[in-house]
Amino acid sequence: MFFGTFNHAIDAKGRTSLPAKFREALAAAGEPRIVLMQYPHWRAVQALPQSVWNELVKKVMEASPLDARWQRNVLKFVSSAHEVDLDVHGRVLVPPPLREWAGLQKDVVWVGMGRTIHLYDRAAYDEQMSAEIPADQVVDFFRTA
């Protein structure tokens, strides 16, 4: 599982270090690579362990090819996916289309989201986090059914 927020830089070639805690979690789970794709709700890159990606692909393959809404989502987001390996320094190379989608500049933020990881441009992340969540949209994680 991935938790926490980590500030890093991304270089001109699109390389950025995956936080050590995330690398350790991947290694402990026997996950040698990650899959990067567009995050559908914000301009961010979503990083998924290979096993989580495989679950997603299985669901996609079970969908009807006649479901236009589903197919549009597959075309838009799943087709943006790139399998990437970490280099010997623990860095990932974020492909140019994903860097452009997320507006990744120099300063980036890795955010652990449980089973997945998000990668944001620092300015966009700060803006998103400074916005208040309307009271009717706040989720009570501790409420019992």
Curated annotation (Swiss-Prot):
Q: Which UniProt keywords apply?
A: Cytoplasm, DNA-binding, Repeat, Transcription, Transcription regulation
Record GO cellular component, one term: cytoplasm
Please indicate if the UniProt record lists DNA-binding as a keyword: yes
The record's listing under Pfam families reads: MraZ (PF02381)
Q: Which CDD domains match?
A: MraZ_C, MraZ_N
Q: Which InterPro entries match?
A: MraZ, MraZ_C, MraZ_dom, MraZ_N, MraZ_sf, SpoVT-AbrB_dom, SpoVT-AbrB_sf
Please classify the protein's predominant subcellular localization into one broad category.
cytoplasm
Enumerate the subcellular locations listed in this protein's record, separating them with semicolons: Cytoplasm, Nucleoid
Protein name, please? Transcriptional regulator MraZ
| GO MF, one example | DNA-binding transcription factor activity
Family label: Belongs to the MraZ family.
Q: Which PANTHER family does the record cross-reference, listed alphabetically?
A: TRANSCRIPTIONAL REGULATOR MRAZ
Q: Name one GO biological process term.
A: negative regulation of DNA-templated transcription initiation
The entry describes its oligomerization and partners as:
Forms oligomers.
